[in-house]
Design a protein with these regions (language model features):
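A short alpha-helix-loop-beta-strand transition element characteristic
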Residues: 228-236
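ATP-dependent adenylate-handling active sites, centered on carboxylate activation for C-N bond formation
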Residues: 1-226, 240-255, 263-339
């Protein structure tokens, strides 16, 4: 992973790192800071043009991510920018976000909106490339629902499914949210050499057993580079970490605009992947305004999910059967602030 970060820092434009304060982005930021002093392009033989890494985080005022990111930035010595947004700013951006991300997937839109707002501010600072932590949760089973995996085989098969679909979800979010403002996002966890090694590990080494946290193997490998509170921080999905009230307000906003009668007619208005929540219906309506063809609707993945699971993983636990919310807080008994 260190080599992957080193390779991906090769750039002739100002760059930075996205730092949510979660384990994955913190590892990438810490590694990037170790290589920041010299130019990668000439095998580290001359001083870098931008010798100090700039890190970026976004959240509602007082959000968990902003506090955690500041802790990491102080520890690794990055020039940190903790950006805030309001719920109203997020709501105002939804139409543009859905246009740029080209999706009506609920969790993608929830997470893409603050990232889109962050990209706008990063662009204004002159940064043209950022490193990001996407991929680790898929490779190492970092989502909270992986706690419910019945055995190592099921755990591994789910990671494979998640990686195969990554371009439809998190990678689409990171790439398109940044590209909307002319910023390139690079993802070291998905470096081919690293991915080959990580997926060759025994699934039992990744399995979450009593006394372990998700991605324990990553936590142990990089514990000496991170503050202890970050190395032991529970997984927060990006849409949760920016502030729990963000998702709550999105759901409330949609409930005010979508009636029960609308939901009763959803399968007729949207015969392809009909939405099953008012929030999903609201996003789908905006998507249809931008992309009215049925073929566009068919390009968007669909299916029930708990905490970003694939539909196949819903069979792991009886508590998943009635769940249809992709937030990590939907995993009862695991998330500290579960619904």
């Amino acid at each position: 992973l260190s080599d992957a970060v080193h390779r991906q820092l090769m750039s002739d434009v100002p760059y930075g790192v996205l730092l949510s304060g979660g384990l994955d982005s913190s590892i990438i930021a810490a590694l990037a800071c170790t290589y920041a002093a010299n130019r990668i392009e000439d095998d580290d033989s001359s001083p870098a043009w931008w010798p100090q890494i700039h890190s970026f985080a976004i959240g509602l005022d007082g959000s968990p991510d902003l506090a955690a990111a500041k802790t990491v930035a102080d520890h690794i010595g990055s020039v940190h920018h903790g950006l805030t947004f309001t719920v109203q700013e997020g709501l105002d951006a939804l139409r543009d976000v859905i246009y740029h991300i080209e999706t009506y997937d609920v969790t993608t839109i929830r997470a893409s909106t603050p990232m889109y707002l962050m990209a706008r501010k990063i662009k204004a600072m002159g940064i043209k490339m950022v490193l990001s932590g996407e991929g680790a949760d898929e490779i190492f089973g970092g989502y909270l629902y992986f706690h419910k995996a019945p055995n190592a085989r099921e755990f591994h098969e789910e990671t494979v499914r998640k990686i195969e679909r990554l371009h439809l979800f998190d990678c689409a979010r990171a790439n398109k949210s940044m590209a909307a403002w002319g910023i390139e996002a690079r993802v070291p966890f998905l470096d081919l050499e690293f991915l080959d090694i990580a997926m060759s590990l025994s699934p039992s080494a990744k399995l979450i057993t009593p006394g372990k946290l998700e991605k324990q193997i990553l936590r142990d490998a990089f514990a000496d580079m991170l503050p202890e509170s970050i190395a032991k921080r529970q997984k927060e999905q990006f849409s949760d970490g920016v502030g729990y009230s963000w998702i709550d307000q999105l759901r409330a906003h949609a409930a005010e605009r979508v009636t029960d009668a609308d939901m009763n007619r959803a399968q007729f208005r949207f015969p392809v992947n009909p939405p099953d929540t008012k929030e999903g219906y609201f996003y789908r309506s905006i998507f249809e305004e931008h992309f009215p063809s049925e073929s566009a609707a068919r390009c968007v993945p669909s299916g029930k999910s708990v905490a970003c699971s694939t539909p196949e993983a819903l069979a792991w636990d009886a508590s998943f059967e009635g769940g249809a919310d992709p937030s990590g807080r939907a995993v009862k008994g695991i998330h500290a602030d579960a619904y």
